[in-house]
Amino acid sequence: RVTENLEPLDRYLDEKKAKRRHRVRRYMTRPVMSTYLKTEVLGEENVKGLEGAFILVPNHSSHLDAPMVFSLLPDWITEKLATGAAADYFYRKRGISSLTSVFFNTYPILRKGKRESVEHGKAAGMTGRLLRAGVPILVFPEGTRSRSGKIGQPKAGAAALAMQVGVPIVPIAMLGGHEAMPVG
């Protein structure tokens, strides 16, 4: 069977693991982010009542983007949130993938034209599988960080998947990440 080789969804669905990841972020990520960045969240009222699976789609200009999302959004949005991470970048070494997994509940995404990681075959279709299981996801639709800080051209994948699975998309505009920690 094809599904026998796929990455199990257990760790993304396990309540105890979600609570542990959440505590790590609350007591480590949030204090670090609030120490170094002055932040402001606008429009939180637009997501009141959002539940179940959805796709968060922020622009991507810095390695600070995922920590900002997890630090600034309400707990009820981020507690079970899984993050699509570039397989060729974050899954090259087990230590990096383990660390990002603890902090951001990551799963590998293969980017077009990039070298496949060993993990990719097991994670095929992971975004759709997570959404169908009720797990909200965070993906950066540009597919990579902006080199200039300007919003890049989004790929169609998140929108196509949202329509296919029938989940809402929550756009997020993030400003200042590139200035605080530019690419390179």
What are the residue ranges of the model-derived segments?
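A short, surface-exposed helix-loop junction/capping segment
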Residues: 4-13
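Helix-enriched interaction subdomains in cytosolic or periplasmic regions
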Residues: 12-25
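Soluble catalytic domains of membrane acyltransferases
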Residues: 18, 35-184
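Generic structural signal of hydrophobic/aromatic residues within well-ordered alpha-helices
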Residues: 9, 24, 99-100
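N-terminal nucleotide/polyanion-binding subdomain common to many enzyme families
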Residues: 24-33
